[in-house]
Amino acid sequence: RMRSPRPPIPEHRRLVLVFGDRLTLSALAIAEPIQPSLVGAATTEDEGVDLVLRAQPDLLICSSDLETGYGPVLLKCVKTELPTCQLLIVLERETKALVREALDAFADGVIFKSSLGTGRGDLIGALHTLADGGVYYPAEIRRLAAAAPQPDLPPLVEELTQRELDVAAAVARGLKNNAIADLLGISLETVKTHVGNAMDKLGARDRTQMAVTALLYGLIDPLEP
């Protein structure tokens, strides 16, 4: 049976691009899933901050390398100034350190530049998952995050239960509550309870922080599909 095509990215989204590579920036700006929602583009960290504050987007897509400045620093600034804006970062280098920096900035989605235009669908998958309110960390991102050294993490005040770990892992894979309930065979209310408990124990303010913190503590299997 053929899969039904994914619906287009909701066009009411206001999207900003900040890329140091002008060729990539130009290509993304005219790409079908992005162009209808694009409200501005920039190439530097300072320009990106100014543009976000002016345009008030609900999604920022940036690269790790910028003409001046640095993508993860831009994400941290935007997260502080406009916490409602979702953050998707495209990493030029596939290293544990860079993945850790992206997650430390609480990016809602992290993909590698090498995946753009390869047919793997990471960009489209990320756009759809973020539009649905999920987080997007492909398996290779989760693997590198779990492998990164974590010397500065304080000990957890309280251990997560197995069900809370299961739910946190599902959130890190981009699943919403309904899908998690179906996957684990539990009620929607039970999922919400586990999410709330896991957030409390991990000191997370939202689902993105919960997923990131669980990954960085090595609490979930990064190789789960």
Label the model's feature ranges.
Residues 100-109, 115-157, 162:
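Short, flexible helix-to-coil linker/hinge segments that flank and couple to helix-turn-helix
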Residues 174-209, 224:
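Recognition helix of helix-turn-helix DNA-binding domains
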Residues 45-48, 58-78, 91-98:
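Conserved phosphotransfer microenvironments
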Residues 150-190:
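Helix-turn-helix DNA-binding segment
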Residues 84-96, 110:
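A short, hydrophobic beta-strand element within the central beta-sheet of small alpha/beta folds
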